[in-house]
């Protein structure tokens, strides 16, 4: 019997990568958790995801063998482990998948099986007597190989008939049998062999899956051999760690033990009993939250951001249940980075952002958590174990208090109460339908059908506009009113001159992408002249010219001359290069946690959205602006390089998480730093100036928040800076002339006006207060007597409500037996303020009068027994309000 070597999780990861590199594998770093250009997936959930294109076309892969350690998240869509996390030994939202792959090798199967078996038994010294394998029931070749490679007899090679041992990418496409390696944790753990009725007991745990993609499914009944085979393998790092560390439960490995120890320290609660589940959930969700934020996902109310918020709030609820009053999750970040930050450097780079967002979300959630829990307690107090909460209530908690369904489910689980999911889903569907009705546009179905048809045809356009401003092209498609047409004739165009789409085989017109707006210009030949008002890019390769015909007739297959508006393109290039320099300056001055969240490169301005936890001060914005202008004045070259993606990243190129890049990429470098690195180095398909001096000048217009942890910077460059400077100078001239001062003394003049205005406001407020405050003598002249009570009823306009409240309060304090009602009208909104003398509050209370008046008028309000107010819109009922109040006082 072999002695298994104890390795911590970081050592296992490194050992795995180095072992397979030694045997001819190229190391590929983990891709972002956000899949590049793959709308079918919320998050990367397996090692093969970043290599899907190579499975379909192995010949496009630069390397035949690859090894990775891939970050994965399963918390949304088909692969959703969120409910089970914390309550089982092996469910996680975030996990690491060790993998090695073969692309296009015909005879790699035996070699891969041999390498994997050697890694487990000779490199890690796992006891091979504890290993068994499964194979697809008809895969005799793999069973034979296991007998020869590992010396396994038939009792340890289990044949499985289900799809568990046959993998496919979908109804059609690459597919093939798989073989799985299981580790036997011993008879102290209940459970049977794979394929038996007791297989879920937990004794035998899958630690490696090897998929042999050797077929292609053409349709439901036809499967053929692949010309080029692939192999996809995956081993859960956390599961391997349990074996090497002699534990059964993933949460007992070194990584989780250290994270849970930090949670115990901060919460002052030991991880025992019910608290053990809370600690496990917090530790797991901390990893998922931090890595998602590091990969550019921000908490929000939809899409990936909502899944992140669900994960965060589930952990935060557990923190609340442990009795913690202050936010805790953000305090756990340093411990996580200490465990994983050396390998995943993005955690260190984004530490400030991760910390801010976790704290901000926990503070926000705490404000609604208590209200939501109060409603949940009220609605479930009469429910017993095994009963069901209404789905309508669960939806109200989601819609009003931000409780994700699984959070409510989690809270009720401890009382063995379920939720009517059907009712919840129905409420959700109704809300979604209402939302769709709000934005559903005319002809949207036609447009969708057209786009689907275009995608099927997939007509790629050759873009020649990097080097040419003019080019010849052949018209291959004309589309108007969401329909293909053979021609567009000016004589058949109505007065509106509807836009149409024109697609050519090649074009100098840049299609809107990467934040850069599309080109405008002219397309013409001897038969027609067409104005191009915009250019868009569909499916990443088809340039569509948005056009209006000016004269003549254009036909399919016509040869046309195409010329972009050079001045318009030049300004786009200026703004695009300025955006790159701005991005670099933001990273230099604010920190490397800066992630681009969006951009717009337009003719007249640029917009750049970045991840940053707080507002950027005016002083820092000035510093950033000065740095950008410094780079511009240096007049350094803006260089284009075509290079392998891995090489670009290794040299520090900035890439967008959401983008999917090919093996060869287009990189733009600007300037150099003292350590011979580029000042700005980004992967980019846009158009740029040749030298930074071509930009001219740069000016920041504004900075604002657009979401939690996301700031927007708007700016201008080039001639627009000169235009703005001229406008500002002319405006200063007009102001100086208006006030009969020089430009240099404008500010002191304005300060004097503000000071004088404040003094006049103060005097006006005092005058208005004096008009409202009443003495005994005034009361005698204007009050109505209702029994022993005196009623003063006044209508006023354009009074500061603070003055009115103060005057009413002081009057009723000084005069007994008085009810004072003042109706103030400001911009068609009425505020009714009611004061009652303290000596009569045993009979009449201001807040009770308010309730009666609201029943009559509508509106809303409240207050105390001596002072209350109502806000309402104007209504003719106000004309009879005094009579209503008199009747109320008389009863």
UniProtKB/Swiss-Prot annotation:
Q: State which Enzyme Commission number(s) the record gives.
A: 6.1.1.7
Name a Pfam family for this protein: DHHA1
Q: Which UniProt keywords apply?
A: Aminoacyl-tRNA synthetase, ATP-binding, Cytoplasm, Ligase, Metal-binding, Nucleotide-binding, Protein biosynthesis, RNA-binding, tRNA-binding, Zinc
Q: Where does Zn(2+) bind?
A: 576, 580, 684, 688
The cofactors required by this protein are:
Zn(2+)
Q: Which InterPro entries match?
A: aa-tRNA-synth_II/BPL/LPL, Ala-tRNA-lgiase_IIc, Ala-tRNA-ligase_IIc_anticod-bd, Ala-tRNA-synth_IIc_core, Ala-tRNA-synth_IIc_N, Ala-tRNA_ligase, Ala_tRNA_ligase_euk/bac, DHHA1_dom
Free-text remark on how the cofactor is bound: Binds 1 zinc ion per subunit.
* GO terms, biological process: alanyl-tRNA aminoacylation; negative regulation of DNA-templated transcription
Q: What residues form the membrane-spanning segments?
A: none
Q: What class of enzyme is it?
A: ligase
Query: Which reaction does this enzyme catalyse, per its entry?
Result: tRNA(Ala) + L-alanine + ATP = L-alanyl-tRNA(Ala) + AMP + diphosphate
- Please state where this protein is localized: Cytoplasm
Task: List the molecular function annotations (GO) for this entry.
Answer: alanine-tRNA ligase activity; aminoacyl-tRNA deacylase activity; ATP binding; tRNA binding; zinc ion binding
**GO annotations of cellular component type:** cytosol
Give the UniProt family note: Belongs to the class-II aminoacyl-tRNA synthetase family.
Q: What is known about what this protein does?
A: Catalyzes the attachment of alanine to tRNA(Ala) in a two-step reaction: alanine is first activated by ATP to form Ala-AMP and then transferred to the acceptor end of tRNA(Ala). Also edits incorrectly charged Ser-tRNA(Ala) and Gly-tRNA(Ala) via its editing domain.
- Domain remarks in the Swiss-Prot or TrEMBL record: Consists of three domains; the N-terminal catalytic domain, the editing domain and the C-terminal C-Ala domain. The editing domain removes incorrectly charged amino acids, while the C-Ala domain, along with tRNA(Ala), serves as a bridge to cooperatively bring together the editing and aminoacylation centers thus stimulating deacylation of misacylated tRNAs.
- According to UniProt, the name of this protein is Alanine--tRNA ligase
Q: Name its species.
A: Orientia tsutsugamushi (strain Boryong)
High-level lineage: Bacteria, Pseudomonadati, Pseudomonadota, Alphaproteobacteria, Rickettsiales
Q: What gene name is listed for this protein?
A: alaS
């Amino acid at each position: 019997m072999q002695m298994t070597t104890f390795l911590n999780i970081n050592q296992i990861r490194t050992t795995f990568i180095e072992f397979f590199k030694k045997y001819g594998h190229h190391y590929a770093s983990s891709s972002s958790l956000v899949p590049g250009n793959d709308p079918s997936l919320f998050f990367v959930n397996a090692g093969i995801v970043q290599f899907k294109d190579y499975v379909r076309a192995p010949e496009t892969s630069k390397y035949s063998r690859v090894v990775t350690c891939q970050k994965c998240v399963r918390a949304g869509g088909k692969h959703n482990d969120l409910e089970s996390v914390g309550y089982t030994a092996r469910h996680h939202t975030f996990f690491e998948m060790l993998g090695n792959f073969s692309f296009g090798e015909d005879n790699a199967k035996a070699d891969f099986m041999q390498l994997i078996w050697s890694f487990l038994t000779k490199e890690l010294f796992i006891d091979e007597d504890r290993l068994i394998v499964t194979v697809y029931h008809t895969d005799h070749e793999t069973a034979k190989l296991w007998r020869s490679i590992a010396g396994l007899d038939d009792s340890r090679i289990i044949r499985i008939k289900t799809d568990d041992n046959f993998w496919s990418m979908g109804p059609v496409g690459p597919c093939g049998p798989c073989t799985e390696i299981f580790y036997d944790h011993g008879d102290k753990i209940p459970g049977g062999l794979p394929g038996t009725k007791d297989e879920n007991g937990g004794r035998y745990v899958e630690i490696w899956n090897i998929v042999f993609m050797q077929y292609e499914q053409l349709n439901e009944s036809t499967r053929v051999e692949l010309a080029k085979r692939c192999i996809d393998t995956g081993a859960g790092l956390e599961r391997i760690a349990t074996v090497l560390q002699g534990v059964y439960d993933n949460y007992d490995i070194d990584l989780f033990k250290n994270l849970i120890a930090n949670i115990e320290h901060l919460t002052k609660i030991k991880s025992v009993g019910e608290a053990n589940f809370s600690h496990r959930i917090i530790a797991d969700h901390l990893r998922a939250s931090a890595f998602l934020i590091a990969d550019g996902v921000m908490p929000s109310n939809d899409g990936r951001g909502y899944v992140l918020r669900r994960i965060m709030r589930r952990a935060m609820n557990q923190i609340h249940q442990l009795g913690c009053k202050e936010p805790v999750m953000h305090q756990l970040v340093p411990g996580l980075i200490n465990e994983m930050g050396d390998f995943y450097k993005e955690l260190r780079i984004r530490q400030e952002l991760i910390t801010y967002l976790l704290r901000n979300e926990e503070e926000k959630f705490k404000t609604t958590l208590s209200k939501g829990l109060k409603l949940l307690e009220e609605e479930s107090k009469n429910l017993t174990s095994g009963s069901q909460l209404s789905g309508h209530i669960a939806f109200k908690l989601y819609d009003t208090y931000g409780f994700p369904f699984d959070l409510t489910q989690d809270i009720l689980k401890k009382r063995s109460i379920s939720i009517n999911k059907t009712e919840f889903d129905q409420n959700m569907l109704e809300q979604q339908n209402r939302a769709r009705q709000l934005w559903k546009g005319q002809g949207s179905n036609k447009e969708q059908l057209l786009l689907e048809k275009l995608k099927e045809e997939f007509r790629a356009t050759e873009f020649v506009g990097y080097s040419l401003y003019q080019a010849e092209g052949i018209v291959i498609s004309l589309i108007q009113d969401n329909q293909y047409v053979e021609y567009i004739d000016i004589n058949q165009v109505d007065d509106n001159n509807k836009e149409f789409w024109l697609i050519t085989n090649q074009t100098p017109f840049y299609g809107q992408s990467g934040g850069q707006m599309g080109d405008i210009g002219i397309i013409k030949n001897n038969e027609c002249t067409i104005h191009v008002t915009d250019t868009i890019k569909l499916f990443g390769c088809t340039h569509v010219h948005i056009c209006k015909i000016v004269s003549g007739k254009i036909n399919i297959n016509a040869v046309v001359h195409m010329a972009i508006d050079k001045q318009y393109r030049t300004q786009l290039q200026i703004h695009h290069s300025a955006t790159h320099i701005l991005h670099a300056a933001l990273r230099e001055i604010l920190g490397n946690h800066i992630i681009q969240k969006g951009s717009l490169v337009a003719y007249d301005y640029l917009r750049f959205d970045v991840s940053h936890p707080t507002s950027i001060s005016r002083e820092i914005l000035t510093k950033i602006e000065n740095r950008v202008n410094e780079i511009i004045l240096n007049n350094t070259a803006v260089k284009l390089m075509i290079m392998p993606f891995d090489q670009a990243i290794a040299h520090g190129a900035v890439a967008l998480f959401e983008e999917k890049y090919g093996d060869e990429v287009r990189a733009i470098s600007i300037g150099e730093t003292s350590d011979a690195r580029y000042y700005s180095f980004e992967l980019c398909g846009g158009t740029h100036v040749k030298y930074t001096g071509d930009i001219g000048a740069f000016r920041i217009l504004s900075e604002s928040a657009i979401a939690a942890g996301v700031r927007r910077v708007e700016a201008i460059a080039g001639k627009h800076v000169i235009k703005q400077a001229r406008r500002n100078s002319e405006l200063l001239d007009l102001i100086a002339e208006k006030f009969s001062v020089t430009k240099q003394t404008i500010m002191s003049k304005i300060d004097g006006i503000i000071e004088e205005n404040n003094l006049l406001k103060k005097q006006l407020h005092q005058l208005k207060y004096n008009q409202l405050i009443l003495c005994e003598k005034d009361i005698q002249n204007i009050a109505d007597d209702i029994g022993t009570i005196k009623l003063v009823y006044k209508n006023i306009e354009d009074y500061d409500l603070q003055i009115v409240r103060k005057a009413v309060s002081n009057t009723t304090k000084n005069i007994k037996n008085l009810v004072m009602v003042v109706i103030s009208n400001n911009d068609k909104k009425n505020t009714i303020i009611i004061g009652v003398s303290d000596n009569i509050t045993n009979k009449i209370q201001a807040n009770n009068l308010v309730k009666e008046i609201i029943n009559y008028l509508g509106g809303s309000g409240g207050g105390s027994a001596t002072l209350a107010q109502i806000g309402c819109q104007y209504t003719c009922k106000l004309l009879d309000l005094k009579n209503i109040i008199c009747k109320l006082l008389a009863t």
